[in-house]
A protein has these predicted regions:
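Conserved beta-sheet core of the metallophosphoesterase superfamily
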Residues: 102-111, 118-123, 128, 132-140
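Core catalytic region of metal-dependent phosphoesterases/phosphodiesterases
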Residues: 2-3, 9-15, 24-118
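Generic serine detector
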Residues: 10, 20, 29, 129-132, ...
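Active-site-proximal beta-strand elements of phosphoester/diester hydrolases
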Residues: 15-23, 121-128
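Active-site-proximal loop/helix segment associated with metal-binding centers of metalloenzymes
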Residues: 125-166
């Protein structure tokens, strides 16, 4: 499926960009597409709404150059004066414990009040914070995350086999 992220009419066109559930470091992350979009649309404020990093797979890391480029881009934007707000998610409850190269230079919070251009106030939280814990336990969530990782790895391997088969036909 093609991805199109056209540049805005002016470089100041984006006041705020909200990013959620990027899962950088997970097998299914599409950091390459995200980076292209972030580079095309600079913003004054970046609100990172949880699960930016996927810190649940310490034994199965999948950190790519594209994942690192997204982190480097956001840190560079912050160094240039953009505001970065990091709202914790369930996959990154302690982002400051990420490996040094994967850390964003920002303080992580559980919730954030965002003020819009017309001064309305919006509460920003990660969706997992309001999920019902009666239906889903922490252990079940961890098992589901591991199963997802393994299925993505299997899918990637099968796709490679199909490509190899096509090349030999």
């Amino acid at each position: 499926m093609p991805f199109d992220c056209p540049a805005p009419p002016s470089r100041a066109a984006c006041r705020t960009v909200f990013l959620s559930d990027l899962h950088l470091g997970a097998m299914g992350s599409r950091a390459d597409l995200l980076l292209a979009c972030l580079q095309a649309r600079p913003a004054d404020i970046y609100v990172l709404v949880g699960d930016i990093l996927d810190l649940w797979q310490p034994l199965l890391p999948h950190w790519t150059a594209a994942d690192q480029a997204v982190i480097d881009h956001l840190n560079a934007r912050a160094a240039a004066g953009a505001d970065l707000v990091y709202v914790r998610g369930n996959h990154d409850p302690e982002p400051d414990r990420a490996p040094p190269h994967a850390r964003l230079h920002v303080r992580a919070v559980c919730e954030h009040i965002h003020r819009t251009g017309d001064q309305r106030r919006l509460l920003v939280v990660h969706g997992d914070s309001v999920d019902s814990r009666l239906v889903r336990t922490h252990l079940a969530t961890r098992i589901g995350s591991l199963a997802n990782h393994l299925l993505l790895r299997l899918d990637r391997g099968l796709r490679r086999l199909v490509e190899i088969g096509r090349a030999h036909v």
